[in-house]
Design a protein with these regions (language model features):
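N- or domain-start disorder-to-order transition segments that initiate the globular core
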Residues: 1-35
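C-terminal structural cap/anchor segments
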Residues: 315-365
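Acidic/histidine-enriched segments that form metal/cofactor-coordinating
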Residues: 77-191, 310, 344, 356-382
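M16/MPP (pitrilysin/insulinase) zinc-metallopeptidase core fold and M16-derived inactive scaffolds
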Residues: 39-109, 292-309
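An aromatic/glycine/proline-enriched structural segment found at the starts
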Residues: 14, 203-261, 265-269
């Protein structure tokens, strides 16, 4: 395994690529009680059009397949074994999640780490689908989708994304729709599994007080039995999307205690930038929004004092290879006034921030939170995997943050925030 030492934060990373293409990362953390393991495929809800291995033709699968597959892999054979109980009996808690761009299976354990790793690998690597079990799962996932649709924040977010995007799959719920999941067949699941769950498209991450050489041997021996060969990168649909928003204003009524407003800005994804610059831009926009709307700012306090927002107020910037957007949201009795003052504040300071003292303080806080996060194996494993797929090491993040200046934040806010393409999305009270 190749070892990289990061002197500034005193961390070591051991990494290798196994013969079947699986990327393995191990970070030893002496004295840690818990070990955290993630097994992740670069397969999320956006990946519904692709070329299967050995084919020159694109295929399209129903929305929600990635999330559906995550559910089914917890039933990896016909024995009916309860995997949650099996992990728990070996002092481990197991879970999984699907996002727009990846699916991750994970556990934290205080004991029996080796056995739990083998159980996790076996679970993910042993698909077992019948049309009967697939059809049974549809009802379960349909109820899950309906439950999410009843959550105001979730509903508002996807209403906004649908208004922003015309054809990009970011506009679709990660779990799909009730209609789309009923189109899923066991053949769809096997096709996606054979394509995206190939070791060449996956990353295994282990962080904790472990013997690196021993854990490597355990994993390498297990993987050698799979008879898989490394494969080239999967060809995905390029996901071309127009620059303009789909709808400038959308509204829906539901049972609420207070109306809700979300402003969504559809930005250019900046696909031609290097990976490190890409991550730096993301961090710079986060700092930009913190300087405008953070809880310590006078502007935030004025919004509270004027009853324009409440504790639901929040904001987010997202920059990914094929899409980018910003959202600002809050429950409010005065959505028109809130929209007016938010847009005015952004227009005033976009590219024009001058408070160096506030910027320096925010940067120090961010660095402090990053250093603190290194005490959490869960934080390290999840963030390292996310950034790995973006082409950056988590432990390079400190250097990237330290390279950010107030001037670069101003430049990025001009380049990455498109005020000409705004969605006004609202939830009104029934």
């Amino acid at each position: 395994m190749r070892e990289t030492y990061y002197e500034q934060i005193d961390e070591r990373v051991f990494e290798t690529e196994l013969n079947n293409g699986l990327k393995l990362f191990i970070i030893p953390k002496k004295g840690f009680q818990k070990t955290f393991v993630t097994y992740t495929t670069k397969f999320g809800s956006l990946d519904n059009k692709f070329k299967p291995y050995g084919s020159d033709t694109f295929v399209t699968v129903p929305d929600g397949v990635a999330h559906f597959l995550e559910h089914k892999l917890f039933e990896n054979d016909d024995t009916g074994e309860d995997l949650f109980t099996a992990f728990a009996e070996d002092n481990a808690q197991v879970n999984a999640f699907t996002s727009f761009d990846r699916t991750s299976y994970l556990f934290s354990a205080t004991d029996h780490v080796e056995r739990n790793i083998i159980r996790l690998l076996t679970m993910v690597e042993s698909p077992y689908f019948t049309q009967e079990t697939v059809d049974k799962e549809k009802g379960i996932i349909a109820e899950e989708i309906k439950m999410y649709q009843e959550q105001p924040g979730y509903k508002l977010m996807f209403n906004t994304l649908k208004a922003m995007y015309d054809t990009h799959p970011i506009r679709v719920d990660i779990a799909g729709s009730v209609e789309s999941i009923y189109e899923i067949t066991k053949d769809d699941l096997y096709l996606c599994y054979e394509t995206f769950y190939h070791p060449s498209n996956m990353v295994l991450f282990v962080v904790g007080d472990v013997d690196v050489a021993h854990i490597y041997d355990v994993i390498a021996t297990h993987e050698a039995q799979r008879d898989k060969e490394a494969q080239p990168q999967i060809v995905r649909d390029p996901l071309v999307e127009k620059e303009t928003v789909n709808e400038a204003k959308v509204s829906e009524t539901m049972k609420l205690q207070s109306p809700r407003l979300m402003l969504g800005f559809k930005n250019k994804p900046l696909t031609d930038e290097p990976n490190a610059t890409f991550v730096k831009r993301d961090l710079e926009m986060t700092l930009f929004y913190e300087m405008l709307f953070g809880e310590e700012t006078d502007f935030y306090q004025s919004l509270l004092n004027e009853d324009l927002i409440d504790e639901t107020f929040g904001y987010q910037f997202v920059l990914e290879p094929t899409y980018s957007f910003s959202v600002i949201t809050s429950a409010t009795q005065y959505p028109d006034k809130l929209k007016e003052v938010l847009l005015s504040e952004i227009e005033k300071y976009q590219g024009n921030l001058t408070d160096v003292e506030a910027f320096d303080l925010l940067k120090k806080q961010f660095i402090g939170e990053f250093i603190s996060g290194l005490n959490s194996p869960e934080y390290i494993a999840n963030q390292y995997t996310k950034l790995y797929f973006e082409g950056v090491s988590l432990f390079d993040l400190l250097d990237i943050v330290e390279s950010i200046t107030l001037e670069s934040v101003n430049e990025t806010s001009r380049a990455c925030l498109n005020l000409a393409q705004v969605v006004d999305s609202r939830l009104e009270m029934k």
